[in-house]
Swiss-Prot record:
GO terms for cellular component: cytoplasm. This is GTPase Obg. It comes from Parabacteroides distasonis (strain ATCC 8503 / DSM 20701 / CIP 104284 / JCM 5825 / NCTC 11152). SUPFAM superfamilies: Obg GTP-binding protein N-terminal domain (SSF82051), P-loop containing nucleoside triphosphate hydrolases (SSF52540). PROSITE patterns: G_OBG (PS51710), GTP1_OBG (PS00905), OBG (PS51883). Its cofactor is Mg(2+). The keyword Ubl conjugation does not apply. Keywords: Cytoplasm, GTP-binding, Hydrolase, Magnesium, Metal-binding, Nucleotide-binding. The gene is obg. Belongs to the TRAFAC class OBG-HflX-like GTPase superfamily. OBG GTPase family.
Length: 386
């Protein structure tokens, strides 16, 4: 079976660069026997950033890049020359990426906009050269500071798709067929449950060159919030959708009951989904006459807009687009929506075994027994660097 290209979570090890060592050097020139200290400062270690990129839709490009490290700052040198700063590392991620600590599952940050840049790890500051420690009583200081150590962290990047409309329904409810009709997306379509095994995105064209994004996720079954079926892994993608389109086939024994089951599964997974606007589409309605449609309308859930559609014949598709656009653009609909990301249980995620990796040791690695803090415990040092 071919490996899926849809990767919505990865685990990576990140390390910033350590600061370069300050130089302990004295000016030595002919006819200047006491030139004094002229050791330069060490360079700053490289930072590690996350940056949103709308050209990425999955985390596939990071699946096999498990170690991301910025470079170290270079040491200072004579003539008060500062060392070169370490090179930053920027991790490009799709918009909607959420970052968690791989050990505790604690939420760290999220990236939702194209070009948004978030610092994940800060590079170490460069150490001060001995020139900075020259005083009236100490004209020839022989000590300098080592650079600050690097920071390291293993994180989990988890993608939650950003879409205007999310399709919610049982397997074989016609979600993929609808997406293929209203957009240029070509999801796999077949007459059996769980045809869709991964989310699909499509851009729906509307009047006057306007458009909105629609997301199709694998079908939800009763008990999905408890881990049954495929729904649990993909339910998180619904959290980012502005509007939920519930899809129930007209052939269902009880349309209202099926809608309530779907609704309850979402609420069990995340009660905050109750606040999202909802629209109901009764699919596969091409065999219904007006009298039967009128009868079924009497038993539908109250307080939710609905429309009868058929993706095969095109019945109600225009009306559905109008309804979705209307709901998406209602007054106050796009007020700032604050999404609270809960911590995750990292034990529920499966990762391939990490390959053993030996990190390179720098030739100028500091003595491990050297106490770093003793050089940075004075606020005066910080003031000297400004």
């Amino acid at each position: 079976m071919a490996e899926s290209n849809f990767v919505d979570y990865v685990k990576i090890y990140c390390r910033s660069g350590k600061g370069g060592r300050g130089s302990s050097h004295f000016r030595r020139e002919k006819y200047i026997p006491k030139g004094g200290p002229d050791g330069g400062d060490g360079g700053r270690g490289g930072h590690v950033y996350l940056r949103g990129n709308r050209n990425y839709w999955t985390l596939l490009h990071l699946k096999y890049e498990r170690h991301i490290m910025a470079t170290n700052g270079e040491s200072g040198s004579a003539k008060r020359s500062s060392g070169k700063d370490g090179e930053d590392r920027v991790i490009e991620v799709p918009c909607g990426t959420v970052v968690y600590d791989a050990e505790t599952g604690e939420f760290i940050c999220d990236v939702t906009e194209d070009g948004q840049q978030v610092m994940l790890l800060k590079g170490g500051r460069g150490g001060l050269g001995n020139f900075n420690f020259k005083t009236a009583t100490n004209q020839a200081p022989r000590y300098s500071q080592p650079g600050e150590p690097a920071l390291e962290r293993t994180v989990i990047l988890q993608l939650k798709l950003l879409a205007d409309v999310g399709l919610v329904g049982f397997p074989n409810a016609g979600k993929s067929t609808l997406l293929s009709v209203v957009s240029a997306a070509k999801p796999k379509i077949a007459n059996y449950p769980f045809t869709t095994l991964e989310p699909n995105l499509g851009i729906v064209s509307y009047r006057d060159n306007r458009s909105f994004v629609m997301a199709d996720i694998p079908g939800i079954i009763e008990g999905a919030s408890e881990g049954k079926g495929l729904g649990l892994r993909f339910l998180r993608h619904i959290e980012r959708n502005s509007l939920l389109l519930f899809m129930v086939p007209a052939e269902a024994d009880d349309i209202k009951k099926e809608y309530e089951i779907l609704h309850n599964e979402l609420v069990k997974y995340n009660p905050e989904l109750l606040d999202k606007r909802r629209v109901l589409a009764i699919t596969k309605s091409d065999m219904l006459d007006e009298e039967l449609i009128e009868a079924l309308s009497q038993d539908l859930p109250e307080g939710i807009p609905y429309v009868f559609i058929s993706s095969i014949t095109g019945l109600g598709i225009v009306e559905l687009k109008d309804l979705l656009w209307k709901e998406l653009n209602k007054e106050n609909f796009h007020e700032a929506e604050r999404i609270v990301h809960k911590n995750i249980d990292v034990s529920t995620l499966e990762f391939e075994d990490d390959d053993e990796y030996i990190f390179p040791v720098d030739e100028d690695e500091d003595d491990p027994d050297e106490e770093y803090e003793e050089y940075w415990d004075d606020d005066e040092d910080e003031d000297t660097r400004k």
